[in-house]
């Protein structure tokens, strides 16, 4: 998905995300962040068992809570996102604003077939992601090493 394309704009709009042109000033390469998040040392800040009632809804609540506490979104609400799927790191960051403000994993699951995504602050320093593990959904928070 080309970041500034009609395809990207329409898909993101269907998920309640507004696409903006332009990324953060010092944005790390997507592949670097994907590798950091794929490390064997990554641990969740929240793990939601799949047998929890409404686990995807709970994952959304937890992700939004962590993202808010860590000030992932800029003052104007924008953040960067990498969506799950083949070629993720090659597509680049998409600069978005969440016009709904809740249930982002569920909205992406419905539109993309996956609830996994990596979100990055506009300054490129804070990561908040979701992940599907064996019998849990994870919310992962990491800071980008300087």
Q: Which role does the model predict for each range below?
A:
Residues 1-136, 141-146:
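Structured alpha/beta or helical-core interaction and ligand-binding surfaces enriched in interleaved
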């Amino acid at each position: 998905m080309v970041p500034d394309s009609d395809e990207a704009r329409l898909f993101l709009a269907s998920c309640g995300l507004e696409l903006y042109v332009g990324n953060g000033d010092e944005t790390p390469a997507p592949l670097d962040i994907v590798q950091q998040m794929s490390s064997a040392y990554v641990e969740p800040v929240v793990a939601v068992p799949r047998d929890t009632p409404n686990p995807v809804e709970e994952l959304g609540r937890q992700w939004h809570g962590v993202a808010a506490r860590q000030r992932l979104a800029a003052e104007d609400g924008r953040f960067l996102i990498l969506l799950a799927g083949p070629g993720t790191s090659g597509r680049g960051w998409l600069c978005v604003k969440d016009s709904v403000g809740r249930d982002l994993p569920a909205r992406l699951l419905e539109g993309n077939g996956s609830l996994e995504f990596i979100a990055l602050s506009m300054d490129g320093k804070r990561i908040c992601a979701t992940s599907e593990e064996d019998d849990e959904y994870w919310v992962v928070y990491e800071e980008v090493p300087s």
